[in-house]
C-alpha cells in the first residue's frame, strides 16, 4: 500500500502559465511596455533559451532571472533596469496562485489518505509566496524547492 505521494506544484496543482502571463503582463505594463501577444511570445523564446542554458550548466539561476529581462528589454529597445524588472516580475508571480480545475480539492482529499510531499523547480522566494497565498503548506509534510536544495529537478543527484 502506498503511504507517500510526491506532487509537482506547477501545472499539476497551480496553473503556472496563467500566473506567468498575468505577472509578466503586469510587469511589462509597469515598465511602459504594452503586453501584446508578440511581446509575450518574444519573452517566452528568450526565457526558454535562458532556462536551457541553465540546464546545460552555462548560466546560473541569477543570470537566467535577470538575463531574460535584459535581453527582452534590449530587443524591445526599452531602457529600463533589468534587475528592477526582475524584482517586479517575481513579486507579481509570487502572488499568482491559480488552481488547476479540481486540484485544490484533490490535494485536500489526498492529504487525508497519504503523506504528501511537494517538489518544485521554481525560484524559492516566488514558490514560497505562491504556496503561502494558496494556503498549500498545510497539506504537505515537506516542500522541496530545487533552488533551496542546490539542484534543478529532475537531477540525478
Where do the language-model regions lie?
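N-terminal helical cap/lid subdomain that shapes the substrate entry/recognition surface
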Residues: 2-9, 13-101
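Conserved H-loop
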Residues: 79, 137-141
